[in-house]
UniProtKB/Swiss-Prot annotation:
Protein name: Small ribosomal subunit protein mS23
Family: Belongs to the mitochondrion-specific ribosomal protein mS23 family.
GO MF annotation: an example: structural constituent of ribosome
Subcellular location(s) per record: Mitochondrion
Species annotation: Neosartorya fischeri (strain ATCC 1020 / DSM 3700 / CBS 544.65 / FGSC A1164 / JCM 1740 / NRRL 181 / WB 181) (Aspergillus fischerianus)
Keyword Membrane in record: no
Keyword Ribonucleoprotein: yes
Superkingdom of the source species: Eukaryota
GO cellular component annotations of the record: mitochondrial small ribosomal subunit
Keywords attached to this entry: Mitochondrion, Ribonucleoprotein, Ribosomal protein
Length: 258
């Protein structure tokens, strides 16, 4: 049948012929099911749906007394696709993705903080009130800034993306500073009552660096000795060669008696 392969569509007919010819003793159990629900016979593949990014904004429209909620659809550029990529599923994008990328590009060290990745439904952020940044039962992290910025964009009239980002970032810095102060005060109070703490992370890192440097210095010394031995095997001992040169130079300077 040309380039089309109908083997999968005719699996029931093949099973019936094999049973009639005696190749199989009993018909398969799925024979009646395939007869009731036959395979699809559509030979034309449809292209995947294009997902559009929808944004919610609160804007003051001309002639309106109060701000109204407006839904904006981001226009996507139509790019010609290769034949091999024509039927691939399209990428699903959310507005939070762009906000998250911008925040972690400006604050890469926030990714080094420990985070809780366990979620019940994947929509845990919807159970918080993001009219404020700090939430009870949730640690302050970069995702809090993203959700706070998104809440400002969806609820504050005529606010820009950069303005919402500045507001959320300023609140984030203030809470981070408050956490650092509380941590320092708690450590000072504990030390005042007799508590002792081990070395800090910086001290541990410096100790590991010193150990690595000492290990490298011993390795470099051994390598230098091996290199000197290889050189001496071809040119002789450097002390003997230096002594011979000194003797020759002295003989040239001192006149030989007649």
């Amino acid at each position: 049948m040309g380039k089309y392969n109908f083997t999968a569509l005719r699996v029931r007919q093949t099973a019936l012929r094999q049973h009639a010819a005696g190749k199989i003793r009993a018909p398969p159990k799925w024979l009646d099911v395939v007869a009731d629900i036959p395979p699809a016979q559509v030979l034309v593949r449809n292209q995947p749906l294009q997902h559009q990014l929808v944004r919610q904004r609160v804007k003051t429209l001309p002639g309106a007394s109060k701000p109204q909620v407006v839904f904006e659809v981001q226009e996507k550029r139509i790019k010609p696709k290769k034949a091999s990529r024509m039927f691939l599923p399209t990428e699903i994008k959310y507005e939070e993705d762009q906000l998250r990328q911008e925040f972690f590009r400006d604050h890469p060290w926030e990714l080094a903080r420990p985070r809780v990745l366990v979620e019940s439904t994947g929509k845990d952020s919807e159970h918080y009130d993001w009219s404020r940044l700090q939430q009870s039962g949730k640690r302050l992290d970069g995702e809090s800034v993203v959700q706070r910025q998104l809440w400002l964009l969806n609820n504050v009239p005529d606010i820009t993306k950069s303005a919402a980002y500045d507001i959320a970032r300023r609140e984030f810095y203030r809470l981070r500073l408050q956490e650092d102060i509380e941590r320092r005060v708690a450590a000072e109070e504990a030390e005042a009552t007799g508590a002792t703490f081990g070395p800090s992370l910086l001290e541990i890192g410096m100790e590991l660096e010193n150990q690595e440097y000492e290990r490298w210095k011993a390795w470099a010394k051994t390598e230098s000795q091996l290199l000197d031995q290889r050189t001496a095997a071809f040119t002789g001992a450097p002390e003997i060669a230096a002594a011979d040169d000194a003797v020759e130079e002295l003989e040239e300077k001192v006149p030989v008696p007649v």
